[in-house]
Structures are given as C-alpha cells and as structure tokens.
C-alpha cells in the first residue's frame, strides 16, 4: 500500500494531537485530585482523603450549572466546597495548589487568616475524609474546578487539625 504525502501529514497531525491530549488530561484524574489533597494533608499530619463518586457527581452537576457565565458562586449544599476558575484551561492539580498556597495566610496558633485561607483549611480539615471533584469548560472558554468534601469543614472557632 502506497502512503501519499497527504496521508503522511494526517498521520503526523494525529500523532501530534494525541501527544497534546494526554498532557491535558494528565492532572485531572481522580487520583490526581486525591494525591494533591493528601500531599497537603500529610505535610501537617492529617490523614488521607478518599475519592467519593457521589461527591464527584454533585461537583459535576453543580459546575455544569455555572458554565454559562463561569462565575464562582457556592452551591450552599450539604458539603464543604472549594471552587476555582481560569480564563483558559486549569488542571485539577493546579486548582488544588491554588487552594493549598493559601497556607501562607493561615496562622494555626490564633486560628486566623491574614487574607484568604478558607480553601486551604477545607483541604486540610481533619474530619473531611471523602472528596469528589469535577472540571467543566465554561461557555466563554474558561474552566471551573469544583471539589466537594464530606463531612464539610470550616466550622467557626474550630481549628482544621
């Protein structure tokens, strides 16, 4: 069978697209979300979280409701919740890292924040042991990441760990 120049170009393009798709999905798996959370938790001696498909379905359903305008509005549901967005693509691991970076704003001794730190405290909340997350592409090309936690955290006057 003779391969034409056009066929070679199509084969090369298919290989390139395949090579690009794999990295885009590389930090959005269930295990990627769990690992990113558990890495932050292990740094302070808090036990690991486990993936919960029911929480993931809740996160996916709610994130799909936000994709019209990509605005971050909390669901006010029964779970703890962290939301992140980007004007372009955002990986799940990058979203978790945004939340974990709020650790710099948290003072454990006084249990206070100097700026925003509630996303971080939810990630490391000792009693939150189940996790479910979703990534949704917004109509404007942006991305929303939603993670839900059970039991929820961030109770007033309680330390996360």
Swiss-Prot record:
The species this protein was found in: Arabidopsis thaliana
Keywords of the record: Disulfide bond, Plant defense, Signal
Expression sites by tissue: Expressed in flowers, stems and roots but not in leaves.
Alphabetical list of PANTHER family matching this protein: CYSTEINE-RICH SECRETORY PROTEIN-RELATED
Described purpose of this protein according to its UniProt entry: Probably involved in the defense reaction of plants against pathogens.
Pfam families according to UniProt: CAP (PF00188)
Disulphide bonds in the chain: 70-138, 113-117, 133-147
UniProt signal peptide: 1-26
CDD domains per UniProt: CAP_PR-1 (cd05381)
Protein name as annotated: Pathogenesis-related protein 1
Cellular component terms per the entry's GO annotation: extracellular region
SMART domains registered for this protein in UniProt: SCP (SM00198)
Induction of synthesis: Accumulates in root tissue in response to ethylene (ET, ACC) and methyl jasmonate (MeJA). Stimulated by the salicylic acid analog 2,6-dichloro-isonicotinic acid (INA). Expressed after wounding. Repressed in response to salicylic acid treatment. Strongly induced in response to the incompatible bacterial pathogen Pseudomonas syringae pv. tomato DC3000 (avrRpt2) but only weakly by the compatible strain P.syringae DC3000. First down-regulated early during diamond back moth (Plutella xylostella) larvae (DBM) feeding before being up-regulated after 24 hours.
InterPro entries registered for this protein in UniProt: Allrgn_V5/Tpx1_CS, CAP_dom, CAP_sf, CRISP-related
An individual GO BP term: response to wounding
Domain annotation SCP: ranges: 34-149
Family stated for the protein in its record: Belongs to the CRISP family.
